[in-house]
Amino acid sequence: MIWIHDISAVLPVSREPERRDPTAIDTVVLHCTAMPGWNVWDTARYHTSPNHISDEGCPTIAYAYFVEADGLAYRCLTPDVRAWHVGLWNDRSIGVCLAYEGAGDGPPSHQLDVAAAVCARVARELGLDASRVLGHRELEGTGYVVERGEHVQRKACPGMMIDMNAFRAHVGRLLEQRLDEEVVDV
């Protein structure tokens, strides 16, 4: 059983976030913090202060879910909150972030297992299949651009050591076996 701890009511907020219709969400995006040692609280403080996304800071943490290196999972935002995690994709996507710097040998396998279960649960709740779980680097316009017919990578997020095809296959197996139903809110 995987427990998702809802901390949405206690995370810092810099201002009232925009709301959206959750039925418009068609993509689950996997991210990494890209900072060594950062946890959900460090990430939330960074996002709600002036940062690389906004000189004013984001209204909230940029991710709806967060998975620590030890596999502890958090719900940070409800699906109706429009988070600032992938530019033009913000209206139609929901973010899941790994506490992982995005380099080295890759995140711990247990952390990836928990992230896959969280992504499967979110996908089922939104009526999506595993093909709609993408890494930030896979999103055109934010993860990569096409210039003069060439694919130009802009982001490595959630880390190049994460095989997104294998991750999607894992999410798909969880959905087929309905194992995502063992992911519960606490």
Protein language model regions, located:
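Basic/polar, cationic surfaces and motifs that engage anionic cell-wall
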Residues: 1-25, 78, 92, 98-186
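Peptidoglycan-targeting cell-wall enzymes and recognition modules
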Residues: 48, 54-58, 72-110
